[in-house]
Amino acid sequence: MATRAVARRQPAASGETGAAGSVRATGEIADRDLVGMYLDEIARTPLLDAAKEVELSQTIEAGVYAGKILDGEVDSDSAGASREELEALVAEGERAKDVFIRSNLRLVVAVARRYPRSGLPLLDLIQEGNAGLVRAVEKFDYAKGFKFSTYATWWIRQAITRSIADQSRTIRLPVHLVEELGRIRRVQREFNRENGRDPEPAEIAAELSSTPERVTDVLDWARDPVSLNMSVDDEGETQFGDLLEDTSAVSPEQSVLTLLRSEELDDLIGQLDDRTASIIKMRYGIEDGRERTLTEVGKQHGLTRERIRQIEKHALLELKRMAHDTGFDAAA
């Protein structure tokens, strides 16, 4: 997997040669080649149907339970199995987990590609998403009745967006840029004190014998904090502020357990009008496991993205209210 990169591309140093630019371009081509190789590799693993997901989940569950017996967390007398049999169950569970993960790696790529403006290479996003997928496999409860792809998408997205947010907090400037930024800031302060306003890039450049473009590059690179309104996904639906942790929010798992139990959700959605029900099903991939963007749903229904967003928000509040009234949320 590619080495983690900083969240923004570093501006070229003054006087950068064409050779340096060629090296960067070659690196970008190499990254694309690696992505292609990775996609070819994971495409060899067949997708799972619902029955196979249940079978693998049961094998994983048995392996976890056997491991607890071996570790003394569960009374071994109640198991009725030898140590060798328990160790075999643990090994089978690990193999099942590996198959489950490898069969869903394409889902990670699909989610990672939604964040082309994140500033992170696609391979890094995939690596973070894979960690979310592993967590989803470990936490998935097949007995709840909801689709694994829908459940896993929450964990994959959480891992990716958290990584994007973390990267923004750990951006570090090279020494030469720190010094250059210091000179720019000094000119800004002096100019503001003398003129009562902030200087334009051209005015700063004149003081430093630089160029307006160079000043803009350095300021853009060093800007902190990143604009909370900066779009990071392909559809403009996720802004940087959406990635910052909300400690008061329920976890993705809690949200899924509350809203995505298939039988209960069908009952609740059945109480919505046809258009709203269709929008919710498309947005969350309830019927086919593929989540649609606001734009896709809007085109399907002849509505704007903003109108779809409003309908979705109202519908989720209504579903939450109905779940509370019927006691579904209490059972989650």
From Swiss-Prot:
One GO BP: DNA-templated transcription initiation
Under the heading Pfam families, the entry gives:
Sigma70_r1_2, Sigma70_r2, Sigma70_r3, Sigma70_r4
Question: What InterPro entries does the database record attribute to this sequence?
Answer: RNA_pol_sigma-70_dom, RNA_pol_sigma70, RNA_pol_sigma70_r1_2, RNA_pol_sigma70_r2, RNA_pol_sigma70_r3, RNA_pol_sigma70_r4, RNA_pol_sigma_r2, RNA_pol_sigma_r3/r4-like
Known DNA-binding region = 294-313
Keywords in alphabetical order, please: DNA-binding, Sigma factor, Transcription, Transcription regulation
What the protein does comes down to: Sigma factors are initiation factors that promote the attachment of RNA polymerase to specific initiation sites and are then released.
Specify the protein name: RNA polymerase principal sigma factor HrdD
Q: Which gene encodes it?
A: hrdD
